[in-house]
Amino acid sequence: MPDYLVVLQAAWIVRKARSVEDAMNIAVAEAGKKLNPDLDFVKIDVGDTACPKCNSPLKAVFMVAGVALVGLIFEMKVFNAKSPEHAAKIAKYEIGKRMPRIPLEVIEVAEIE
């Protein structure tokens, strides 16, 4: 059975952030705390989005009045999955179990050689 790299995105709310950079750091740290120690192999990063006007890449963070919505990316290797769909289900289950109120969406599943 093949191995897969599954990429998920999540919407993370950060309250009382002083800046966009602060919100990104807090979101990654909070997500890391929820995943550790069981899933410390999951890579966490702030996602990117494209500017609707010029198409240049921007960090996926929106901040108003000290509250930020941060788009996080989780990368997880899933071993011995039956199919890409099965790998996505496993990753979503394992991460979602530790973050029950965080919306997760699969954005990519790639087979690892």
Swiss-Prot record:
One Pfam assignment: DUF555
Domain of life (superkingdom): Archaea
InterPro entries, sorted: UPF0212
Database matches in PANTHER family: UPF0212 PROTEIN MJ0068, UPF0212 PROTEIN TK1194
Similarity remark: Belongs to the UPF0212 family.
Full protein name: UPF0212 protein AF_0282
Organism the protein comes from: Archaeoglobus fulgidus (strain ATCC 49558 / DSM 4304 / JCM 9628 / NBRC 100126 / VC-16)
